[in-house]
């Protein structure tokens, strides 16, 4: 419950309006992506599954990983419900959600990534917004992140 509360507080502090959800799934032989897409779009009330963008990434061993990325426009979806499920992903939830969902705000130029109950990453273009988030939410940072964030805020 603490992880969810922290995720929501940071989510709302980062931006008041998210206009896209980017959903990314790794292609694997034993993975039924169509089932995940159906579940994701129906459970979280996305009307239509967009065409995927295929992304190839070479891992540290030289293997090529192929991801399918889907950009869902946000209309009236309950994004807090989606956040709750991401936080629960590793604890009896839908494990395909772990590390696979990004929330995008074009208004605030924010990328918000709650990867699971372990934490949140927020990419911010605006230095003032980064400072505001750091100042208002520094008590939510984990100790091991504090030194790096202080360095980034100082510039």
Model-predicted regions and their roles:
Residues 1-96:
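Extended, low-hydrophobicity segments enriched in charged/polar residues
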């Amino acid at each position: 419950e603490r992880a969810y509360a922290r995720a929501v507080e940071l989510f709302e502090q980062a931006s008041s309006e998210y206009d896209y959800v980017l959903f990314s799934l790794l292609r694997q032989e034993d993975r039924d992506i169509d089932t995940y897409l159906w579940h994701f779009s129906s459970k979280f009330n996305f009307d239509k599954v967009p065409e995927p963008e295929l992304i190839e990434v070479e891992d540290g061993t030289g293997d090529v990983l192929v991801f399918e990325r889907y950009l869902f426009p946000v209309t009236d979806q309950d994004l807090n419900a989606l956040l709750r499920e991401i936080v629960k992903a590793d604890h009896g939830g839908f494990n395909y959600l772990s590390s696979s969902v990004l929330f995008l705000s074009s208004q605030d130029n924010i990328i918000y990534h709650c990867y699971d109950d372990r934490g949140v990453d927020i990419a911010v273009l605006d230095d003032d917004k980064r400072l505001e988030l750091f100042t208002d939410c520094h008590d939510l940072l984990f100790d091991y992140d504090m030194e790096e964030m202080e360095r980034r805020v100082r510039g």
